[in-house]
Amino acid sequence: MYLPQEIIRKKRDNKELTTEEINFFIQGVAKETVSEGQIAAFAMAVYFNEMTMPERIALTCAMRDSGMVIDWSHMNFDGPIVDKHSTGGVGDVTSLMLGPMVAACGGYVPMISGRGLGHTGGTLDKLESIAGYNITPSNDVFGKVTKEAGVAIIGQTGDLAPADKRVYATRDVTATVDNISLITASILSKKLAAGLDSLVMDVKVGSGAFMPTYEASEELAKSIVAVANGAGTKTTALLTDMNQVLASTAGNALEVREAIRFLTGEYRNPRLYEVTMALCAEMLVIANLAKDEQDARAKLQTVLDNGKAAECFGKMVFGLGGPSDIIENYDNHLESAQIIKPVFADTTGFVHAMDTRDLGMAVVGMGGGRRVASDTIDYAVGLSDMIRLGQTADNQQPLAMIHARNEEQWQQAANAVKAAIVISEKQPEATPEVYRKIRPEDV
């Protein structure tokens, strides 16, 4: 028998907690015998003193086991259960192509996703822009769609990692969000509760990333790889670039359109293509669905070319309550904005830098994201035809097309877009799409 305050005192004094102490504390969080004040004190103690890898693994497992852990064994899947998690960015629509692409190559992708908060878009908000799509199906429907389509993207249910919900809500109001140990446990407790065989992490780097510096992003990626593997789930991470909007679009219905056009081959933004392929290839390799990256990329290109990946997306949407013809007639099922006009730079020159976070906030400002969790979303608004770093902006080449509800909203967004993009006489150095891969042996 332990006392919560003694566990807090021990961490406050920078001593290592045992697995039993961590389990006791987190069970108390889930059962609500540990108060919000005690959670806050614990989070602050961890914030200042960090946790060792064994502590992080124990915290992650305790939070994972605080609720239901999905067991897929009764489904008799004939392939591995794989998933991807991204730390979030702007125009980061990879999940919508990646799930179907991996499914078409023989993996099963039961993806439990989040909503957008702050400047980052949320996969669930994007999917909810499709009329009828149900992000909260029963467990039976979730399993059935995963089996039949190979992929199902849904929202987090209250039964998964309930301790994380309480800890996160407290961290959010006590300035303890940005701590590697707590972030690692929060991300992984939810992901590992989904009963995965393997996981690939996409950790963003740059002006639109969650972590402020390359070093911090790398540290988070290493922590996640070490902890997930320590908790028994084969995991690797890719550090990918978020110094510019990843896709050509940012906004909910706009990104769904881009994902469908990508899957059918109508249009594939080259940076989005490279990041999506790199993540998918890593998923196939660690799940033993491909020999190596080259083999994986060949398989992925095949399912894009023969339409199998697009078919998996269509099956998922229909299975979760959406229209049966989303691939063929997507424009019939996705909202469009009333005003669609280009915004031009005030000077001519190269696009030297972008404040990707501010571009994300421009979409939020139009109603395309949330400032607080209770906000409703306008699915139609956003940016499309985004200019890329190194391209020339002039009176022929706009910075973006702005999709707005009215003229006033368009003008505000236009000012925000111009302020977020730096035009210069000299061309910027090219940034890679993928900086590095972190495998278990690297940590």
Swiss-Prot record:
SMART domains: PYNP_C
Cellular component annotations (GO), alphabetically ordered: cytosol
GO molecular function term, any single one: 1,4-alpha-oligoglucan phosphorylase activity
Catalytic activity: thymidine + phosphate = 2-deoxy-alpha-D-ribose 1-phosphate + thymine
Keyword check for Glycosyltransferase: yes
Superkingdom of this protein's organism: Bacteria
EC number: 2.4.2.4
Pathway info: Pyrimidine metabolism; dTMP biosynthesis via salvage pathway; dTMP from thymine: step 1/2
GO terms of biological process kind: pyrimidine nucleobase metabolic process; thymidine metabolic process
Keywords: Glycosyltransferase, Transferase
Functional summary from the UniProt entry: The enzymes which catalyze the reversible phosphorolysis of pyrimidine nucleosides are involved in the degradation of these compounds and in their utilization as carbon and energy sources, or in the rescue of pyrimidine bases for nucleotide synthesis.
Family, as annotated: Belongs to the thymidine/pyrimidine-nucleoside phosphorylase family.
Subunit composition and interactions: Homodimer.
Protein name per its UniProtKB record: Thymidine phosphorylase
